[in-house]
Amino acid sequence: MTSIKEQAAISRLLSFLQEWDNAGKVARSHILDKFIETNQGKTAPELEQEFSQGASLFLVRLTTSLRITYMTDSCLEKLLRSIGIFLSAVSSNRYLIEFLEVGGVLTLLEILGLEKIKEEAKKESVKLLQVIANSGRTYKELICESYGVRSIAEFLAKSKSEETQEEVQVLLDSLVHGNPKYQNQVYKGLIALLPCESPKAQQLSLQTLRTAQPIIGTTHPSIVDCVLKVLGTMHLEVQYEAIELIKDLVGYDVRQALLKGLVALLIPSVKEISKLQAKILSDPSVLQLTPSLPMFLQQAAAAKAIGVLARNDMSIAEELLYLRVVRGLMAAMGNTDHSNSQRLASLTLECFVQMFPLVAEHVRKCMGEELYQLFLSNAEDLYMKIDSIQADILAANTVNVTKALCLHGSSYSMNTLYGSRDSAQMAYLTHFEEDVESKE
């Protein structure tokens, strides 16, 4: 026999459920407002007490309403927030299972792909997916098995709200942790985002890739080209994240490909330059846009990245010498169409000149005494002081430090400046020299 108190509670619950069932759009909106206000942050036992051990009866009504109305955006944000109260409650595993059993994950992912749904509702959908993903490995796998990575990545690329995009980053970060079965899928999805048009999405993808790379261990072959292309961005915050990722990636098996790619960007291809010249001849206004052309932005960013890498690791600096980085930097210094390339290349060349006496000798010989002294006195402002003839000399230089390094041995500069290397490092460099010599 139930007590009078219990009967009264059950009666209140039935009355509430009947009110919901009979309510129209406006009335349901008010019910949801009140539910959110009074139940935010409650635990599962507290929700059960509130609903006389029948909380699931209201949850099933919320999920049913969600499935029926989500395409019309009717009270969608409030519905999602209300469901979130159940799913995020402490000890709410039962509610989570009930939601998933009726296809909750697929509904949330579909919401992300619908253009007519408001951004705020999509953000709430992402938050629910976060709750599900944070509930354990099984739930992360369920999201991935529902083509979730693709849906989430596409939404990140298309979203117009930076706040929402940051919520998506949190979700992707969760999916890459503790998800060995599908972590590679998430990793590839992040790489696929790099060419997208949204600077914020690029920035967040690069940040998450830095977190994901140590978890994945191996690198995907496409990551090198994708990251190098991102260097052509006009957005400094994206460029910064790309360089930070490059700093991490040189510790993996793509190191040589990355270094070669960076050096190659210092001298734009003849094909690209010919395209630019053709555009200028047909439309002189293109001249005004040259500072923002991707190939020049890449050139400047590559010079900057090379400087960062060389200052951080002497062995990388020496590898770059074998890739003829000095020639590339001097060529960039002669690019009068892009002053930032000239400035950054000059600063990076200064670093190599200070680190390697042999480089200083070759640079001095190529520049001539007058230009070299100008360079030493203020490398950063050199581009403002050189004339067209000096710029042409720099752009057309044929400096080749590689042969001289091989003749003198890798210890020529480094032993003089920094003392002897350990045997493992010397063995690595000897192998690197032999590889270069075989290609000469």
Swiss-Prot record:
Q: Name one Pfam family in it.
A: DUF5578
Judging by the UniProt lineage, the source's domain of life is: Eukaryota
List where the protein spans the membrane: none
Q: Which residues form a coiled coil?
A: none
Any Gene Ontology CC annotation: plasma membrane
For this entry, the protein name equals Armadillo-like helical domain containing protein 1
Provenance organism: Homo sapiens (Human)
Q: Which gene encodes it?
A: ARMH1
